[in-house]
Every structure is written in structure tokens, then in C-alpha cells.
Regions:
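Alpha/beta-hydrolase superfamily serine-hydrolase fold, recognizing
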Residues: 1-301
Length: 301
């Protein structure tokens, strides 16, 4: 049954890949951005254990750092998926690390977290090769990448969680996190829960008794969680309720949090991760500016 479901989901993500490729073909990269590509953050030769670095060609001194984790339902995509988005972040005066990680069904979500943490360890050990300010770091992610980023931020401040997920302390402090449409509740009723449990390597059609598939199960183990900006929109059919729920959880637990909940724009619903899909659109550009301002506020805090 699970193999059949994976085949169905794989077809869905294949259609999504074609749509994303067409969307990217309509866009242009910003000018004046230096790219350094395909650094191997693990020495195993895996094509998904690579990351890129982008930053303005003309800059003065060290730049604040953004580390991005792409979305794609834990099954689809690599660093190329968010390249345009990341370069437009870099164009706002930041140095951006953009990583790939292994995908389901080859691996499960906990193993993807191990990949993300391995990339962060490499970044920590190699940051001084780049014009990067290690005292100013924001972690970002969208959709599935938002979930991975949300959990990674918890791992950064929690030794018990690092032991549970079998990851090392990667040695980075996040000034803040930006989570766009994070799918942070994966053991829930309905199709979303069935899909989420499969991504964790669990049976899809029975509620999982293992801990930590839902973010509210780990927040109490992560004191000192960094300030969080959450982004969703009226047409965010995958994660509107989840993003709002995570914002409410942060408020209850005393985490500094801000929610950007976009209504209709020019009479139309803004889709899931709209600013990531088209960062220079009339709706995406001001959203990106808000993200940059949020980061700069927490550099100065």
C-alpha cells in the first residue's frame, strides 16, 4: 500500500516540477550576485549533499547570513528550486546558503533533519571562507522546508532533542527564523496526517504513537527558541491553518513571534508560498522586504 501511495505522490510532484520549471522560466535572476556552487557538505558524493552560496558582488565588510531550506513535500526538489528566491534575498544585502537534502522515500524526515544539521555544521566550519557575519544568522524555510527549519531551530537550543534525532551540535546561533507556510503538524487526522506519517516512515493509516511528529510536542524541550516570523496567505491550502496554529503555539509558549497572514491581493487569493514562487511579483516583493527588515531588526536587538 505504501509503495502505491508513494507512486501516486511521485506523479503529483512530477506535475508540480513542470509547473515550477515553467514559473522559473518566466523569471530572471537579479544582477550583481556572485554565485559559488556545489560545495559538498558531506564527503559521500551524494548529489543532494551539496549547497550553494550567493552574495552581492559589490559589498563592504561581512554580510548578515541567511540559510534557506527548500520545500517540496519532503519528496521533491533541490537547491535549484529556491535559487531565484535565495538570490533575491542576497540582492537585499545578505549572504545566502542554499542547500539540498535527501528526499523521501529514500530517507525519512528525521534523516532529512540530519542532512540539514550536517549542512549547518559545514557552514559553521567553513563560514570564514566567505564574507559572512557569523553573529548575524537567520534560518528560513518554506512548506516542508519550513517544517525542517522549525525543527532545526529547536535542535539548535536543545541537547535532549539533538540526542533524540541523533544530530551533533552544529555550533550556530540563529538570531531569528522565517517560516513560510510551515507544515509543522504531521500526525493529524485526514490525508495530511497519512502523508505526514509516511514521510516519517510510519504507517499512514493509523495514528502514530512515536513522539515529536507535531511541533507542539517539542516546543517545551526548546527553551530559548529564536524569534520567528511566520508567513501564510488566503490561498495557502496546504498550510494556512498550520501556520496560524504554530503562531498561536509560539504566543502561548512565550516565543517572540510575528504572523504575516496575507488576504486576497488585487482580488485574488495568494497561493501557497507565493513569495518563494515569485519573489519579485507585486505581492512577493513587499513580502521579501518585510522578511529582510525583520532580520535586520533582530541583528540589532
Amino acid at each position: 500500500m505504501e509503495q502505491t501511495l508513494f507512486k501516486i505522490y511521485d506523479k503529483f510532484w512530477g506535475v508540480t516540477e513542470k509547473k515550477d520549471a515553467a514559473n522559473h522560466a518566466r523569471q530572471h535572476l537579479p544582477e550583481g550576485i556572485k554565485e559559488e556552487n556545489d560545495f559538498a557538505y558531506l564527503p559521500d558524493g551524494h548529489r543532494y549533499h551539496l549547497l550553494d552560496v550567493y552574495y552581492p558582488e559589490n559589498h563592504e565588510g561581512k554580510l548578515p547570513v541567511v540559510i534557506d531550506v527548500h520545500g517540496g513535500g519532503w519528496m521533491y526538489g533541490d537547491k535549484e528550486l529556491n535559487k531565484i528566491y535565495c538570490e533575491y534575498i542576497a540582492a537585499r544585502g545578505f549572504l545566502v546558503f542554499n542547500m539540498s537534502y535527501r528526499l523521501a522515500p529514500e530517507v525519512t524526515v528525521p534523516e532529512q533533519l540530519q542532512d540539514v544539521c550536517a549542512a549547518l555544521k559545514w557552514i559553521n566550519e567553513n563560514m570564514d571562507r566567505f564574507p559572512a557575519d557569523r553573529n548575524a544568522i537567520m534560518l528560513t524555510g518554506d512548506s516542508a522546508g519550513g517544517q525542517l527549519s522549525a525543527y532545526t531551530a529547536a535542535l539548535s537550543v536543545s541537547e535532549p532533542l539533538r540526542r533524540h534525532f541523533d544530530v551533533e551540535d552544529f555550533g550556530l546561533h540563529f538570531n531569528c527564523v522565517t517560516l513560510t507556510s510551515p507544515v509543522a503538524y504531521m500526525n493529524v487526522p485526514g490525508y495530511m496526517g497519512a502523508y505526514g506519517r509516511m514521510m516519517w516512515g510510519e504507517p499512514p493509516f493509523q495514528r502514530c504513537v512515536k513522539p515529536y511528529l507535531n511541533f507542539d510536542e517539542i516546543i517545551d524541550l526548546a527553551p530559548g527558541y529564536p524569534p520567528a516570523l511566520l508567513i501564510t496567505s488566503s490561498g495557502d491550502f496546504m498550510a494556512l491553518k498550520q501556520t496560524r496554529a504554530l503562531h498561536e503555539l509560539f504566543m502561548r509558549k512565550g516565543v517572540s513571534t510575528k504572523l504575516l497572514d496575507y488576504p486576497k491581493y488585487e482580488g485574488k487569493n495568494l497561493p501557497h508560498v507565493f513569495a518563494v514562487l515569485d519573489p519579485e511579483s507585486s505581492a512577493g516583493k513587499p513580502c521579501m522586504d518585510t522578511v529582510a527588515a525583520f532580520f535586520r531588526e533582530h541583528i540589532q536587538a
